[in-house]
Amino acid sequence: MLPLGSEPALNELLLRKEEEWRALQAHRTQLQEAALQDTRSQLEEAQGKLRCLQEDFVYNLQVLEERDLELERYDAAFAQAREWEEARRAEVSELKIEAAKLRQALAREARKVEELQQQQQLAFQEHRLELERVHSDKNGEIDHHREQYENLKWTLERKLEELDGELALQRQELLLEFESKMRKREHEFRLQADNMSNTALSRELKVKLLHKELEALKEAGAKAAESLQRAEATNAELERKLQSRAGELQDLEAMSRARVKDLEDKLHSVQLTRKKEEETFKRKHEELDRLAREKDAVLVAVKGAHVEQLQELQTRVLELQAHCETLEAQLRRAEWRQADTAKEKDAAIDQLREDASTVKSAWDAQIAQLSKEMVSRDLQIQTLQEEEVKLKAQVARSQQDIERYKQQLSLAVERERSLERDQVQLGLDWQRRCDDIERDQIQKSEALIQGLSMAKSQVAAKLQETEQALQEQEVVLKAVTLERDQAVQALRMHGLPRPGAQMLLRQHEEEISKDFPSSEIQRLREQNTSLRNAIAQMRKEMEALSHQIPPPIQTAAESTDANQPDPEAGGDAATPDYVLALEAEIRTLKHKFKTLEKHLEDVLDPLKMSSPHAESQPSVRTSTETTGGSAQAGQAGGSVQAGQAGGSVQAGPVSSGLALRKLGDRVQLLNLLVTRLRQKVLREPLEPAALQRELPREVDQVHLEVLELRKQVAELGKHLRIAQHGGAEPSGRKQPPASDAVALGREDAKSAEDEAPSRHLGKHQPRSAQVGSRLDALQGPKTQHSIHTVTCKSPRQKEDRSPKPPQAPQHPEEHGRQSHSSSSFASGTLQDMWRLLDLGSSPSGVTSQGDSTPELPAPPAADRRPVKMQAGIATPGMKTAAQAKAKTTGASRSHPAKAKGCQRPPKIRNYNIMD
């Protein structure tokens, strides 16, 4: 228990404690209010930072949205650029298609150029005349301008000479003036120097006198010294003046030289200014043209830039409007946020007031709570700062991406412009290439036309030369034929001599025939020995082939020979003199055939030498000539064998069968030669240009030759049947014309079947028709006439043509008519040989190589010659055969006039275009 005296102390202590507690409570409230203010300020700062972060976040979101929109625009721009690229590629493909169409059009134009050749030739002649006239006019103008130029040059030279004379006079005058002035100055200087020297001498004398009087006159010595000093000073002044005058003299010389040089420079400058004025005039003219072009280009560029600027400004206005709308929305959202924050602030103040009332009751818990909240806020601030740094980095990256996208967009725009420029340049390049190709094609066609015209003129000249040579040879052959006919006529008029006399006569004829040819034929014989060897080798090959290939009507001929009896014994017993005459005639025909074969080779050799094609392709030409030679030998051999058959006594149906078999064999040999040549061409391919030139026409020529050979076979069979009609036959013999006709029909069918594959293969094999061109030289006038008539008909009519059926044989007549038929057949064989010679010597059988150009008809002399021979060889009782031959020759003579009607004008072919 406390004492009573301690109560006031306790009360005082309580009062002190209450006051302390109140002071502590007031201090604590002050501290809490300060802390509350601090927390409020920190909260406001945090809220401000939060608002800034929210605004930054919203701004970043807007930036991202704008970037997405820009990316979408970029994607659309890239898609549009891709579409433009695809459109450009489509345009390029269309341009390629148009280029192909242009090539086709060029090909068509080339074909039209071929059709308009004659018009072009006329136009060329007119243009040539106009060019000559213009050339003469321009030459007159050039002469006039040359005279004007010479006059101007002469006047300028005269003016230059006058200026040179004036300059020389001025130079001489200046030099004279300068020399006179120099002489005056030198004279003056010399006078002054003399005066100075005189004064110097006088002063020296005075000095000497003064020196002499020095001892006596000391007072005068000082004066003399002073006068000496003055004299030295004057002397120095005079020397300085002399030096200055010398400098002036040098200056005058330099001035005169400078004046002369200035005058020369002025003259040179006048010339240079005249040249410069001319150059400046030209340059100004060029600069005006260039400035005009640059002005147009600048106007176009400024227009394009103005359009682009307008587009950019429109896009900028749209972007600014969108930005203003976004800013207004942000402002409204900020006002809403500010109202929300004010409400939240009032609520927070009320809450803080309630918290302040509760803090007084639980200070420790509040301190702990505040510390925890401070720590959490610090952590939040730190996280917000980190997020702010991240957002700033993201914003920087987005800005970099935006810059990169802008650069890519600018590069894409530049690429687009470059692509447009490349497209325009490509169009111009294509146009230029098309123009160049068209110009080159026109130049090539013109060069081809010129080359063809030159080649045509050269070939015409060479053909004229060969025709002259052939005419000379024909004159020689006419002389030989006339001599032979006269000799035979004389022998027949005086009677046939004995065999010994015949042998002597034949030897004499051989000597005459050897000595008679002219020196030209002898020279040609010496040149063609190598060709004869080749022809002999080919003849051997043809004989081997003829032995290998069986004739189609051999069985019929053998049956005919078996059914017919051998009339040789009876014939020898009946007419021995006539048989001897026939044998002698056969021997002479053999010898004559050899000479004619040599003449034919001599005729073919200059044609081969004069051919322009032999230089470009010698190997192919040699092979075709040897092949043609073999065909000639085969055909000539066939004619000789036919002549032998006609010369014998059994010259009736056996001779006709042999002739038909020989002609059928010749057709088979022709087909075989064509196939062999095709195989050879397959083994040795030619150049494409030569193949294009020669393939179509040579194949058509071979087909034409085959058809004409068939027609000749049919005509010869018909001719033989007519001859058999007029001839006499024994009663016991039977002639089988039906078998010959059947065999002939089979031969025609077989050759027609061979024609189809050969025609198909002829499209791919060149030079196969050169055999036909050589065989054309071996056919008779009837074949030539048939070629003229067939060229005007269609190929279908040629293939549908067939020989007429043979006529029935008549009853046999007397024995004399049989001898008449055999002799007429022999004369027909001789006529065939002469026709072969005439056709071989004519240029139409060798030079007929074009498709549309028909062959030239045989000369009328070639048709009249066999009639003379027939009249010379036939006996007086041969009117029927002679009339038949005369009709045949008359018909062949009238054919050239008909053939002229169906001839077409020659057409120059463009070998640059593929068929």
Swiss-Prot record:
Sorted UniProt keywords: Coiled coil, Cytoplasm, Cytoskeleton
In which organism is this protein found? Homo sapiens (Human)
Q: Where is this region: Disordered?
A: 555-574, 606-653, 724-915
Gene Ontology terms, cellular component aspect? centriolar satellite; centriole; centrosome; cytoplasm; spindle microtubule
Q: Coiled-coil intervals in this record?
A: 92-173, 214-422, 456-483, 521-548
Subcellular location(s): the record lists: Cytoplasm, Cytoskeleton, Microtubule organizing center, Centrosome; Cytoplasm, Cytoskeleton, Microtubule organizing center, Centrosome, Centriolar satellite; Cytoplasm, Cytoskeleton, Microtubule organizing center, Centrosome, Centriole; Cytoplasm, Cytoskeleton, Spindle
How does this chain assemble?
Answer: Interacts with CEP63; the interaction is required for their location to proximal end of centrioles. Interacts with microtubules.
* Segments of this protein annotated with the region Microtubule binding domain: 606-915
Q: Which Gene Ontology BP annotations are present?
A: centriole replication; cilium assembly; G2/M transition of mitotic cell cycle; microtubule nucleation; positive regulation of mitotic cell cycle
UniProt protein name: Coiled-coil domain-containing protein 57
Biased composition, class Polar residues, residue ranges: 613-627, 781-794, 819-830, 841-852
Residues covered by region (Centrosomal targeting domain): 1-502
Give the Low complexity compositional bias ranges. 628-652, 879-891
Q: Basic and acidic residues: which segments have biased composition?
A: 745-758
Q: Tell me, what does this protein do in biology? A: Pleiotropic regulator of centriole duplication, mitosis, and ciliogenesis. Critical interface between centrosome and microtubule-mediated cellular processes. Centriole duplication protein required for recruitment of CEP63, CEP152, and PLK4 to the centrosome. Independent of its centrosomal targeting, localizes to and interacts with microtubules and regulates microtubule nucleation, stability, and mitotic progression.
- Specify the domain of life of the species encoding this protein: Eukaryota
